[in-house]
Amino acid sequence: MSYNGIGLKSAKGSSTSGHVQRSLASNNRRRPQGSQQQRQQRQNAIKKASHDKASRPLAVQKQIETHMEKREIEVQVSELRDRLEEEETLSEEQIDKKCEALRAKLTNEWQEQQRMSSLYTPRKARLTEEQHRHE
């Protein structure tokens, strides 16, 4: 029932016939590499693709950070709305006005913080950020 040490020692109790087949997954042949020029072009394309991916995380990280900060503002507004609705002392319009006022206040504070942090960005960081924006 086994062939070259592969397979069952005995098919008894295995609910199979014990037949051993060749594995179609094993492929030891190498792909043809092509000419030197084709190999060089492939390597250059791989390097370029990996370089592009390596430069993205800065911009993506900045977008994620901005999104999370805006989300935090909305969470605070939502918590205020829930608290005011539970009290049931204000009308829906008054609750909306208070929520909009809080959202505007928090957004202005966040924008001011963004402006201040951009003023004190090191020159090298500003240059790399500008390069990523123009690409």
Swiss-Prot record:
Q: Where is this region: Disordered?
A: 1-67, 110-135
Can you give the residue ranges of the CWF21 domain?
65-109
**Where does the record place a coiled coil?**
65-102
Composition bias, kind Polar residues: at what positions?
12-27, 110-120
UniProt xrefs under Pfam families = cwf21
Keyword hit for Nucleus: yes
Q: Which GO terms describe its biological process?
A: mRNA splicing, via spliceosome
PANTHER family linked: SERINE/ARGININE REPETITIVE MATRIX 2, SERINE_ARGININE REPETITIVE MATRIX 2
Assembly notes: Associates with the NTC complex (or PRP19-associated complex), composed of at least CEF1, CLF1, ISY1, NTC20, SNT309, SYF1, SYF2, and PRP19.
Instruction: Name the family the entry cites.
Output: Belongs to the CWC21 family.
What function does the entry list?
Answer: Involved in pre-mRNA splicing. May function at or prior to the first catalytic step of splicing at the catalytic center of the spliceosome, together with ISY1. May do so by stabilizing the catalytic center or the position of the RNA substrate.
Protein's UniProt name: Pre-mRNA-splicing factor CWC21
Which species expresses this protein natively? Saccharomyces cerevisiae (strain ATCC 204508 / S288c)
Gene encoding the protein:
CWC21
